[in-house]
Amino acid sequence: KIRVISENDNGIYDAINKGIKYATGDLIFILHSDDYFYANNILNEIVSLFKIKNPEVVYGNLLYVNKNYLPLRFWKSSMYERDLFFKGWSPPHPTFVTKKSNYKKYGAYISGFGNSADVELMYRFLQINKLSSIYLDKTFVCMKYGGISNKNLLSVLRQNIILLKIFKIHLNIFKIIKFFFFKLINRVKQFVDAKKLNSKKTNNYYR
C-alpha cells in the first residue's frame, strides 16, 4: 500500500521527518527522489537480516551513476568502529536502514543542520547512542550524481565545517587535518573503484 502526501514543508529533512511520522512499518528505508534499488531482492535481504540478527541499524554500499546510468562513483562502506566519524567516515545515508522506534527514542533529523543533517543523525545513532549495526556488503541503491549534497565544492565544504562542529573537533587542527585527509583518500578511492565496475547501465534494475 502506497500513501502519497503532498504539503508544504521546511526543506528536505522536514519532509523526511513527516514521512517517518506517517510510516506504519517497523523499519524505515528512505529512498530519495531519482534514486532506485540496485537489485529487486535487496529489501528481502535487509529484512531477513533484521529478523535473524536483530540489529538496530543495517547499511550497505551506494553506487552513484551519471545521466546515462553508468557507474561514476562507488561508495563501498565498511563495518562501523567507534570514532570512525572523526576520520571523515559515515555510512552512505541512502543505504541507512533502522527501526522506526529509534527515531522515537533518539530523535529524527534536525533541519537546522542543512545538508549535514543525515550524517548528524547517523553519528547520533551510532557514535553517541551506540546502536548495534551490521554492514551488509551489497549495493543497496543507485543514486544520480549531482544531487543537492554534491552540488559544488563550496556546498561540500560548508557541510564538512558543520560536521566538524557537530563532532566537536573544529578547534583541533590535528583532528581537522586527519578528518579531511581520510575523507579525501576515501573519495578518490570511490571514483577509482567505479572505474573497475562493469560499464553496463544500471537503469534496468528495480526502480
Residue ranges and their predicted role:
Residues 119, 124, 146, 157, ...:
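Short, surface-exposed, charged/polar-biased interaction segments
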Residues 164-207:
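Membrane-interface aromatic/basic loop that binds lipid-linked glycans or pyrophosphate carriers
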Residues 17, 44-47, 157, 161, ...:
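Generic alpha-helical structural signal
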Residues 1-152, 195, 199:
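Nucleotide-sugar donor-binding/catalytic module of glycosyltransferases
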Residues 138-139, 151-174:
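Catalytic core of nucleotide-sugar-dependent glycosyltransferases
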